[in-house]
């Protein structure tokens, strides 16, 4: 909410120059005002939607998946998704209002991700089984393929097949236009 307020305040100053993080400098005061205003409106929309869903008791992992952003915001050139998605902003809003608790009972005192991954890998039939499944999903569900690659890697970080899978899946995810992943950490 503070971000939206700050953007509206900046828009009211009739600035003659705006240097955005991406793209060319803006020098038309009307265009600057419109850009700042639509950014504020977008943030306000996400905050309002997120808070309304939380107040209805919607589980957090479903709140950000329930976003149905109005077309005029989705198609506005100023709101071209670069690094942060609408869902990411909703998650930030939730973190502010509800903290770390995500309504999933096992997350209260969870096992480490490494331990969870080792058990998931074992249940799946080993790293090779996860490798086959993740690669089968690469073209249709890169997000799920990423989860599977993470389980293989974190469950068995010394396994060369797990490392190759992790690298291949995230290299694919970087170039996938449906994902806002821009970089990768490779071990």
How does the language model describe each region?
Residues 2, 62, 144-145, 161:
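Alpha-helical positions within canonical tetratricopeptide repeat
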Residues 2-62, 66-101, 105, 169:
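Divalent-metal (often Zn2+) His-rich catalytic cores of metallo-beta-lactamase-fold enzymes
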Residues 58, 124, 157-160:
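Short coil turns that delineate tetratricopeptide repeat
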Residues 116-155:
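Alpha-helical segment of the N-proximal tetratricopeptide repeat
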Residues 131-132, 161-167:
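Alpha-solenoid helical repeat scaffolds
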Residues 144-150, 177-187:
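Alpha-helical repeat scaffolds
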Residues 169-176:
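TPR/TPR-like alpha-solenoid repeats
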């Amino acid at each position: 909410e503070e971000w939206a307020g700050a953007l509206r305040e900046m828009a009211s100053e009739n600035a003659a120059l705006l240097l955005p993080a991406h793209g060319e400098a803006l020098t038309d005061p009307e265009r600057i005002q419109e850009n700042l205003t639509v950014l504020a409106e977008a943030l306000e929309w996400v905050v309002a939607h997120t808070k309304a869903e939380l107040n209805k008791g919607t589980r957090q992992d479903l709140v950000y998946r329930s976003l149905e952003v109005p077309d005029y915001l989705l198609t506005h050139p100023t709101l071209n998704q670069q690094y942060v998605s609408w869902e990411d902003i909703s998650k930030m809003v939730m973190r502010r209002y509800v903290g770390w608790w995500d309504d999933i009972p096992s997350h209260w005192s969870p096992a480490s991700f490494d331990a969870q991954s080792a058990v998931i890998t074992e249940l799946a039939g080993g790293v090779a089984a996860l490798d086959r499944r993740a690669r089968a999903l690469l073209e249709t569900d890169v997000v799920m393929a990423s989860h599977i690659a993470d389980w293989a890697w974190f469950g068995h970080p010394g396994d060369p097949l797990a490392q190759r899978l992790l690298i291949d899946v995230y290299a694919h995810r970087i170039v996938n236009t449906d994902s806002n992943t821009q970089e990768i950490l490779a071990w």
